[in-house]
């Protein structure tokens, strides 16, 4: 049933992709991506400085969503393209209460069902009013230089380039293994 639900979502969902305009003075990030320090799923502080020089795919995740099978695609991307892109997952309960679990439950679910080894962060909100600081940066042009697109559902994706500049937004309907994503990763 979950596979059918996922296939129907993929079939009928709109594939929105927003791309950063050509570099101008107004499209340069006002705050550096590398300034962030956020808690991992197991409570350790992760310094984003360690991601310098790497492309980063940021995804808001949920365990009870029609798009949850994208965890498998994200894991495959991590395993096959991990030298080119780092995947950061942000569990959130913003859409339909589809991430009700604790950090421990989320970690166990992801490991058992998808063998997730990419970095997952502590459950947080990806929307205002209690939006986590990274998602504030991702969704406010005054901080990232151009993008105002907030997640509209679970499994929306943001691609950050090797210089810490926000490059792309992909809607939930865009597979992490899609031609669009793989082309940008290189």
Where does each model-flagged region fall?
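Conserved helix-turn-beta segment immediately C-terminal to the redox Cys motif
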Residues: 54-55, 64, 68-93, 110-114
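Thiol-/selenol-based redox modules, centered on thioredoxin-like
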Residues: 133-136, 140-186
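N-terminal "domain-start" segment that seeds a small globular fold
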Residues: 13-49, 133
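Short, internal strand/loop/helix patches
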Residues: 104-152
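Thiol-based oxidoreductase modules, predominantly thioredoxin-like and allied folds used
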Residues: 60, 84-102, 117-128
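Amphipathic alpha-helical repeat scaffolds
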Residues: 40, 60-64
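Short hydrophobic helices that act as membrane-entry/anchoring signals
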Residues: 1-17
């Amino acid at each position: 049933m979950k596979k059918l639900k996922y296939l129907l979502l993929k079939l009928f969902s709109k594939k929105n992709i927003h791309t950063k305009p050509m570099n101008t003075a107004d499209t340069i990030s006002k705050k550096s991506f590398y300034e962030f320090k956020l808690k991992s799923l197991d409570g350790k502080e992760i310094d984003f400085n360690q991601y310098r020089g790497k492309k980063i795919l940021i995804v808001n995740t949920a365990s009870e969503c029609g798009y949850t099978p994208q965890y498998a695609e994200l894991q495959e991307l991590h395993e096959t393209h991990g030298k080119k892109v780092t995947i950061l997952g942000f569990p959130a309960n913003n859409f339909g209460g589809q991430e009700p679990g604790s950090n421990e439950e989320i970690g166990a679910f992801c490991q058992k069902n998808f063998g997730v080894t990419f970095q997952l962060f502590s459950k947080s909100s990806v929307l205002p009013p209690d939006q986590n600081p990274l998602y504030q940066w991702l969704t406010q042009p005054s901080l990232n230089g151009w993008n105002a697109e907030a997640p509209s559902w679970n499994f929306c994706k943001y691609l950050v380039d090797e210089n810490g500049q926000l490059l792309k937004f992909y809607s939930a309907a865009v597979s992490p293994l899609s031609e669009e994503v793989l082309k940008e990763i290189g």
